[in-house]
Amino acid sequence: FLFLYCYEFIFLLFLKRRLGKEEFFMDLMKGKKGIIFGVSNTHGIAYGIAKQLFDEGADIAFTYAGEAMEKRVKPIAESMNAKLIMSCDVTKEEEVEAVFKECEKIYGKLDFVVHAVAFAPKEDLMGRFVDTSKEGWDIALGVSAYSLVRVCRHAEPLMNEGSSIFALTYLGSVLSVPSYNVMGVAKAALESAMRFLAVDLGSKGIRVNCLSSGPVKTLASMGIAGFSKMLKAATMRAPMKRNVSLEDVGKAGLYLASDLSSGTTGEVIYVDCGCHSAYASAEEMDVISKAE
């Protein structure tokens, strides 16, 4: 028996070396069906995740927010052979419910759901946080945080045992980040909601997590005042001395969506080259010393 085990192990190592690790781990998501809320273009984090899942064999449904986004999302979804491409305003109960009813008709059961939806009025991302409007607060938390609760409620009956739901968050949930303001509060609420959802759904074998990416140059992020400085600061502080790529984040999304994360729930998984773990880099301390 031991001989056979060793032989099998050596054979697997041979295959890995012969094929290369990318080919060796192909089809990790074969037979898995799921939906992604929030893909908007080919430069965003949600797309990076979708690409990794599709390349590993996943069958993905897509939603988009309104007619304007349909022109961007439809070609992406079609390139990934999507069976379902549907408009969905996550602030409307009936639209989220309708999406999952269509999922049930087409797929029956689901294995993963990705929540990549966030929004706050631009004026509430600028200036001082103390000047946040009540309307901006309600919009930011409704779209960016409560929508995860709504999505999970309608997804729950369709999720297979051992399935995964995860949402995108950011370090601004636990640290004050310039020009992030009310969105930081929304992401903090999202992460807290995730933990309660993980407890609610865990007994049914459904995992719920958050994926916290470092700053990535996307169309959305470039609209944030001073974002280029955020990128430089993240590079300086990160132990790996670089920013994350869409591929980095996509691979982490693949981990959370696949059976590789079968024992992980209620967690915030950071993919930021270690930026969240460092108080300050040596370079930053030098700058401070010179300023004294």
Feature names for model-found ranges:
Residues 38-47, 118-153, 161-203, 215-217, ...:
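Catalytic loop of short-chain dehydrogenase/reductase
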Residues 88, 92-97, 101, 105-106, ...:
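Conserved mid-core segment of classical short-chain dehydrogenase/reductases
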Residues 208, 212-223:
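Short, flexible catalytic-loop segment of classical short-chain dehydrogenase/reductase
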Residues 202, 207, 264-266:
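Short, small/polar-rich loop/turn modules that mediate ligand/substrate recognition or access, typified
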Residues 27-62:
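Canonical Rossmann dinucleotide-binding motif of NAD(H)/NADP(H)-dependent dehydrogenases/reductases
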Residues 254, 265-292:
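Short C-terminal tail/terminal secondary-structure segment
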Residues 238-249, 260:
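A conserved structural motif in NAD(P)-dependent oxidoreductases
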Residues 54, 108, 159-161, 199-204, ...:
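A short hydrophobic alpha-helix cap/turn motif
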